[in-house]
Structure formats: structure tokens, C-alpha cells
Amino acid sequence: MKIGILGAGNIGATAARLFVAAGHDVAVSNSRGPDSLRELISELGPQAHAMTIRDAARFGDAVLLAVPWRTPEALPEPELLRNKIVMDAMNPYRPDGGFYDLGGSTSSEEVLKRLPGSRLVKAFNTIYYV
């Protein structure tokens, strides 16, 4: 399976390692661009590719969202993820350790509002990283 990973921090990079070890091809992206991912991609080997966020979203049969909650601009346009499996590993944490007020909504409901038509699955939200 081809998996696009949006976010290359603790969760995104760890997931990339695990997906590659399981035999999947991955496209890793972050807000700083593909050049900033050279070391990680080198570590992961030929099954891994550094891409822009939009290209990683296009690449994946499934896509992992592993970007900070405060950066919704890191999410691609909804049409790029329409009908794709989207694994939501985001949590509404503020930088100070508190939570963003979602007005009674859940984080997954908020993500689905931003990405209508995707097949959203909440995943990895109770772990920091493996």
C-alpha cells in the first residue's frame, strides 16, 4: 500500500519507519518542504520519498495526518483526500499543554468538516510516539 504522511515529527517519522518495515511505500511531508527530510528518507531507504504536503496527499492510498492542531493550513485541499482512508493522529493540544476549545465538537468532527468526503479513522491519538 502507498501511504502519504503529512507531518514528520515524532508520530509521523515513527509511523513512516513502521510502515516501511511492514513493506509499504511512504511519502513523507512537512511544512518545511522535501529538502528538510533528506536524513529521514535516507534512513528509511528506497520505499520512502520526500514530497510536498499536496504531493504526499495525492500519493497515498491512505494518508496519515500527523501535523500539530494549530497548523490547519498544513492540511491539503479536501478534494485531494476525497474517498481516501485518512488516519487522523491529530489532537487539539495548545502549545502551552492545554486544549483548544472545540465548542463541544470532537477533534475528528472538526477534521471531517475540513476534509469532507474522506474516510476518516481516528488513530494513534493516545500515544506520543513509539
Place the predicted regions along the sequence by residue:
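Rossmann-fold NAD(P)-binding glycine/threonine-rich loop
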Residues: 89-130
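Short amphipathic alpha-helical segments
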Residues: 16-18, 40-41, 75-79, 98-100
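NAD(P)+-binding Rossmann beta1-loop-alpha1 motif at the extreme N-terminus of oxidoreductases
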Residues: 1-43
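Fold-independent oxyanion-binding glycine-rich loops
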Residues: 8, 30-31, 53, 67-68, ...
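Rossmann-like NAD(P)-binding element
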Residues: 45-47, 51-96
